[in-house]
């Protein structure tokens, strides 16, 4: 199993990147969002990877964080969602947008992804709504970048310093902490996830304490 790729980018396209690792070129499929955040050709990068094995095909899929990789695994557990459709969903919504859509039951948000129709979007929400809080709770624990980058050989012209792929925003940690706090208060995972997602949608940059207060207001009994 290949869990991480670190090397020099030889070519970057919208949906894949060719990475040279000690003379061997690996084609790694990525979302458009990830591709846009990668450094240009000639610079070093590192990605977490998932290897898809079929009878006649081996494909590598790359992710800037372990959290995004975990969301990809969860998406592909749904019937009708292949690895590339899962990438399209992540590329369209990002990990934060996906977690919010699942927690709120907003299947229309998933329809924005290429290749996702209304029936598939509804199936994804129905099957993953109760599973999403577990991944959301992992939060910042899985948003670390893929680690040190290899040195880039200087050949004739100077090559800029290696630039890692951009990691997921720190809001993932605030979300995880808020979910943990609400769980300690006795709220069900799906109930807490829905409230935290709605609170985060209203104020994306909210720190943990503010997120908890906002979620508690949403969970308070309505008069």
UniProtKB/Swiss-Prot annotation:
UniProt-listed Gene3D superfamilies: 5' to 3' exonuclease, C-terminal subdomain, DNA helicase RuvA subunit, C-terminal domain, Nucleic acid-binding proteins
Xref: InterPro entries: DNA_helicase_Holl-junc_RuvA_I, Hlx-hairpin-Hlx_DNA-bd_motif, NA-bd_OB-fold, RuvA, RuvA_2-like, RuvA_C, RuvA_C_sf
Record's comment describing the protein's domains: Has three domains with a flexible linker between the domains II and III and assumes an 'L' shape. Domain III is highly mobile and contacts RuvB.
Keyword DNA repair in annotation: yes
Signal peptide start and end residues: none
Protein family per UniProt: Belongs to the RuvA family.
Major subcellular site: cytoplasm
Alphabetical keyword list: Cytoplasm, DNA damage, DNA recombination, DNA repair, DNA-binding
UniProt region (Domain II), positions on chain: 65-143
GO cellular component: cytoplasm; Holliday junction helicase complex; Holliday junction resolvase complex
Function: The RuvA-RuvB-RuvC complex processes Holliday junction (HJ) DNA during genetic recombination and DNA repair, while the RuvA-RuvB complex plays an important role in the rescue of blocked DNA replication forks via replication fork reversal (RFR). RuvA specifically binds to HJ cruciform DNA, conferring on it an open structure. The RuvB hexamer acts as an ATP-dependent pump, pulling dsDNA into and through the RuvAB complex. HJ branch migration allows RuvC to scan DNA until it finds its consensus sequence, where it cleaves and resolves the cruciform DNA.
Assembly, per entry: Homotetramer. Forms an RuvA(8)-RuvB(12)-Holliday junction (HJ) complex. HJ DNA is sandwiched between 2 RuvA tetramers; dsDNA enters through RuvA and exits via RuvB. An RuvB hexamer assembles on each DNA strand where it exits the tetramer. Each RuvB hexamer is contacted by two RuvA subunits (via domain III) on 2 adjacent RuvB subunits; this complex drives branch migration. In the full resolvosome a probable DNA-RuvA(4)-RuvB(12)-RuvC(2) complex forms which resolves the HJ.
GO BP annotations listed: DNA recombination; DNA repair
Full protein name: Holliday junction branch migration complex subunit RuvA
Region (Flexible linker): 144-169
Cell compartments where the protein resides: Cytoplasm
